[in-house]
Amino acid sequence: MAETKTLAAAARHGTGKGAARSVRREGRIPGVIYGGGDPAEPITLDYRELNKLIYAGHFLTTLFEIDVAGTKQRVIPRDYQLDPIKDLPLHVDFLRLKPGASLKVEVPVHFLNQETCPGVKKGGSVNIVRHSIELRVPADDIPEAITADLGELEINDSLHLTALALPQGCRPTQRERDFTIVTITPPLVVAETPVAAAAAAAAPKGKAGAKAAPAAAAAPAAPAKKK
């Protein structure tokens, strides 16, 4: 189960681009909490704290308990915008989580036993097709990751979605497709080029070639022409 982190926020009273710019000048980032049958609630968050959380990774699958003036709400980030040039946060959206609710999230896949994989030991390579899977999960029990064990895969073997053990209550959003998660590809074999093959065939072989050289060297020189 994913860890729930705490996050302090303040109520935001102005809306629109002008109000958002004013919030950012104060070192804060505008955001909104929505969903769960309650009205949308504009908020502001500390710029440095939010920026750190976004770039720490897995921001969109992290549960937060947001405290707005003493009122705590359980939420999950659903979207955020970054400045296209500076890559700094501009806005963030949070979805309220009600008891018993479910939601769609991208859950990362962790690949185990890559070093001991039989196919890798024989020269194969791990080809990861999907680094994450979209799942519908309980809002109060979001998995941090799904594991894929490569410990028994040979060269040309694959792991598909149905081979993964999903946590209780979690199901893939694309249940009609048993897509590939990872494959073990064979080692790359460099084929001999036609030019190299022709050169090898034309090269002198064994003692016959060695004897031919002295014979050619022993041939008498042509007589000089008389003037």
Curated annotation (Swiss-Prot):
GO terms for cellular component: cytosolic large ribosomal subunit. It comes from the Bacteria. Residues 1-22 are annotated as: Disordered. GO terms for biological process: translation. Keywords: Ribonucleoprotein, Ribosomal protein, RNA-binding, rRNA-binding. One of its GO terms (molecular function) is 5S rRNA binding. This is one of the proteins that binds to the 5S RNA in the ribosome where it forms part of the central protuberance. Belongs to the bacterial ribosomal protein bL25 family. CTC subfamily. Part of the 50S ribosomal subunit; part of the 5S rRNA/L5/L18/L25 subcomplex. Contacts the 5S rRNA. Binds to the 5S rRNA independently of L5 and L18. This is Large ribosomal subunit protein bL25. The lineage of its organism: Bacteria, Pseudomonadati, Pseudomonadota, Alphaproteobacteria, Hyphomicrobiales.
